[in-house]
Amino acid sequence: MAQSLTRVHFQVFLILLLCFAAAGYAGYLAMHDLQLSSYQHRASQTARAASDRITELLTQQRQRLEKIAGQPGVLGVLQRGVPAERERKEDEIKSMLPGAVAVRLLPRNGPGTMPSTETLDRACLDFIRRVSMANTPVAPEFHAIGAATEHYDIAVAVRDENRKPAGYLLASFARAPLQSAIELALPPGGYMELQQAMADDQWQTVIALGQVASAGTASVVSTPSDSRWTLMFQSGEVPSAILSGNRIFYFAFILLAL
C-alpha cells in the first residue's frame, strides 16, 4: 500500500513538473516572439522614415525642375536653338539646383528621337527616350554607378504654348543629398542599402551605409514612392542572450531548475 502511494505521488510530481516546464517554455517562446515582433516593428518604422525622406527630396527636386521648365525663357532658348545661348541657360539653371552636377536642355525632334549632336552617354540617352515616350513622369535613375561620374538623373518636359513637349530639361544630381537623407534616418548599429532595379531583373546597390548586421537581426525592405529604388534596412538589434540560442537547451534548463 505504501509503495503504491509513493508511486502515485511520484507520478503526480512528474506531471506537475512537466506542466511547469511546459508553461515555462511557452513563456519563453512568447517573450522571444514578442521581442522579435517589437524589433521588426521598429525596423519597419525606421525604413519607412528613410523612404519618406528620399521621396521628399526627389519630390522637391522634381518640383524645382518643373517650375524652371515652365518659364518662358527656357522654352525660348529651346526654340531658338542657339548653342551658346543654351549653354548659358544650362549654367544658370544648374546654379539654381542644389546638388546638381550637370544640366542639359534637350530639344525634341520627334517622338522618342533626340538630336545626334547631343553628347549624352548611352544610359542617359535611353533614359531621355523613355521620358519622351511616357505619358507620366519617369522615375529617377542612377547612371555610371561606381564610377567617378556617378549621378542620378531627373528629367521633365519643357512644353510649348499648346502644352506639347518642345524638349526636355535633364538634371544630374550627385548622390550626396540622397545619402544625407538616408544617414539622418539610420540609427547607430544599423545598415541601409539603396538598390536600383536593372533591365535584367537584377538589383544593383547604389548606396550602402553602416555595417552589415549579424544573422538574427530584424531586416525589412521599403520602397520610396515613384522610384525604381528599394531600401533595405537591418536594425542591428539582437535579442538578449536569454531569449536567443538553442531552445532545447532552455527547455532542459527549466526542467533542471524545477
Predicted segments with their positions:
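Non-catalytic regulatory/interaction regions at protein termini and inter-domain linkers
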Residues: 1-6, 10, 18, 34, ...
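Alpha-helical transmembrane segments and their helix-membrane boundary motifs
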Residues: 4-17, 244-256
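Juxtamembrane extracytoplasmic/periplasmic/luminal helical "stalk" adjacent to the first N-terminal
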Residues: 9-12, 16-80
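Short N-terminal helix-loop-first-beta-strand/juxtamembrane motif that initiates sensory/input modules
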Residues: 63-64, 91-111, 183-202
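Extracytoplasmic/periplasmic ligand-binding sensor regions of membrane-associated signaling proteins
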Residues: 97-171
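Sensory-domain boundary capping and coupling elements
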Residues: 169-172, 233-235
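Extracellular/periplasmic juxtamembrane segments that couple receptor/chemosensory ectodomains to their
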Residues: 198-258
